[in-house]
């Protein structure tokens, strides 16, 4: 067992930061059910773009992105439409940990057709590089069917 996974139980067991990071990194699920549901809708949308529409990184356009409201409705989370960024951040963390392009790059504001303000602070995401991240997402064949 790696040394940093060993800890003593002195009354109250407190996991070290390294143990928490290890567990989070190798977790197969999202931190919240909401993030998992959103991620699964984004995975469905990714498959739709690649399989049904036969899009490539060169042919995808902003009109193919999934507006936050539609994303939340499809996940039966309509009440999150205005605050969905927090959960999309968890999706970004999962993608970053799994070393795949950010699925959350496919989710956009309906009016502007670009991601919301929180996109820039999400793991592995940069608003300045957003379109390249979308293209990498569309090209990726490593995503699971479901999370």
Predicted region positions:
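Intrinsically disordered, low-complexity domain-flanking/linker segments in eukaryotic proteins
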Residues: 54-58
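Intrinsically disordered, charged low-complexity linkers and terminal tails
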Residues: 1-14, 83-84, 98-100
């Amino acid at each position: 067992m790696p040394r940093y996974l060993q800890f003593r139980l002195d009354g109250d067991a407190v996991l070290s930061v390294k143990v928490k990071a290890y567990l989070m990194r190798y977790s197969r699920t999202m931190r919240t059910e909401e993030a998992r549901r959103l991620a699964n809708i984004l995975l469905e949308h990714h498959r739709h773009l690649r399989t049904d529409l036969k899009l490539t990184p060169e042919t995808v356009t902003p009109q193919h992105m999934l507006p936050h409201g539609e994303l939340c409705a499809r996940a039966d989370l309509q009440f999150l439409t205005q605050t969905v960024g927090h959960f999309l951040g968890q999706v970004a963390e999962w993608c970053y940990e799994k070393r795949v392009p950010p699925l959350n790059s496919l989710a956009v504001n309906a009016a502007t057709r670009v991601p919301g303000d929180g996109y820039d602070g999400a793991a592995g995401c940069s608003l300045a590089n957003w379109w390249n991240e979308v293209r990498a997402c569309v090209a990726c064949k490593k995503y699971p069917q479901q999370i």
